[in-house]
């Protein structure tokens, strides 16, 4: 089983415009609302690829039933810590050139009691998990150390995967050795101090993670594909050419597919190929909708990997 831990769920409102004109009237051409959160997106991706998944994290009571309905329909088992209040709303504004502008809310505060409940719940659920994924931001008022506290208490036998910004990543790395991280180019540069100009720079930058005990680095290069490295072997997979509707959720889709590959024990090349196929398939959907398996399989058949 794959466990996902989502500390900061969101309702993502994706707004389509001809172009975004700041300080002027903008007319909406399309709008899609999805019940989201990075680790919840991972859970959906895992389930769509046919593997069992349990989703936990904080969930705000006023929208909890809707979130759980959406996730249950995807075949995901839900076991959240209920909190008073409303789920934050994030706005994703996309123009006809696929330029994305994001306006993200921070969410409501979570009490110390609820924080302790999630630490215990994640610990308990991880006892039956093979892989645990924690990703995304934290609600208002939570210190980055909370990432470390959750991860520190997970079962010692579970493989831990983290996709988070630098401050939360550092807290996670201080808690235990991580099985895999998934930085994008900006996150990789910020963490390592290495400017990414060519593929070999990705390998050099990844060494900073290996020094912290990380086993695998899955580096997302956007439209250029991705690199998967363990410090000894490194592979590159270029994305397939597709019509891009929205890049939101592509990284979460990559994490989902990579975790499924890890769970099934496939070689590094296949983990990478599956991750790139899922991420590429995700950008063909509107809003924050994730990939569908038919599109994933079609793109997968077109991809090639190369050893660096």
What are these regions (language model features)?
Residues 102-104, 129-136, 163, 182-187:
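Short beta-strands and strand-loop turn motifs
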Residues 145-232:
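Conserved phosphate/ATP/ADP-binding segment of small-molecule kinases
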Residues 44, 91-93, 225-229:
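Short beta-strand scaffold segments in enzyme catalytic cores
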Residues 24, 48-129, 297-308:
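Conserved N-terminal subdomain of the carbohydrate kinase-like
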Residues 1-56, 64-66, 238:
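Glycine-rich phosphate/adenosyl-contacting loop at the front of the ribokinase-like
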Residues 3, 54, 79, 133, ...:
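Structural detector of well-ordered beta-strand residues that form the stable sheet scaffold
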Residues 46, 184, 251:
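Short, conserved phosphate/pyrophosphate- and ester-handling motifs at nucleotide-, phospho-/glycolipid
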Residues 171, 199-308:
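Conserved phosphate-binding/catalytic region of the ribokinase-like
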């Amino acid at each position: 089983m794959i466990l996902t831990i989502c500390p900061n769920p969101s309702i993502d409102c994706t707004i389509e415009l001809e172009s975004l004109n700041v300080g002027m009237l903008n007319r909406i051409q399309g709008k899609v609302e999805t019940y989201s959160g990075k680790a919840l997106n991972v859970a959906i991706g895992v389930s769509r690829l046919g593997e069992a998944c349990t989703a936990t994290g904080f969930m705000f009571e006023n929208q909890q039933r809707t979130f759980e309905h959406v996730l249950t329909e995807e075949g995901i088992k839900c076991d959240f810590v209920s909190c008073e209040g409303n789920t934050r709303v994030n706005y994703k504004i996309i123009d006809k050139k696929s330029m994305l502008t994001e306006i993200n809310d921070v969410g409501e505060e979570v009490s110390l009691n609820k924080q302790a409940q999630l630490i215990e719940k994640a610990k308990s659920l991880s006892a039956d998990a093979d892989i645990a994924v924690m990703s995304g931001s934290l609600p208002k008022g939570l210190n980055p150390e909370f990432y470390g506290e959750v991860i520190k208490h997970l079962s010692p036998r579970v493989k831990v995967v983290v996709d988070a910004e630098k401050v939360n990543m550092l807290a996670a790395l201080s808690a235990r050795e991580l099985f895999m991280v998934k930085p994008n180019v900006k996150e990789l540069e910020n963490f390592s101090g290495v400017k990414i100009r060519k593929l070999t720079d990705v390998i050099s930058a990844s060494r900073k993670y290996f020094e912290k005990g990380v086993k695998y680095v899955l580096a997302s290069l956007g439209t250029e594909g991705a690199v998967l490295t363990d410090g000894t072997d490194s592979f590159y997979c270029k994305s397939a050419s597709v019509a891009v509707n929205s890049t939101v959720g592509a990284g979460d889709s990559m994490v989902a597919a990579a975790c499924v590959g890890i769970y099934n024990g496939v070689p590094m090349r296949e983990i990478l190929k599956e991750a790139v196929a899922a991420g590429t398939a995700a950008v063909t959907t509107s809003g924050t909708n994730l990939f569908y398996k038919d599109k994933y399989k079609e793109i997968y058949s077109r991809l090639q990997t190369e050893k660096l």
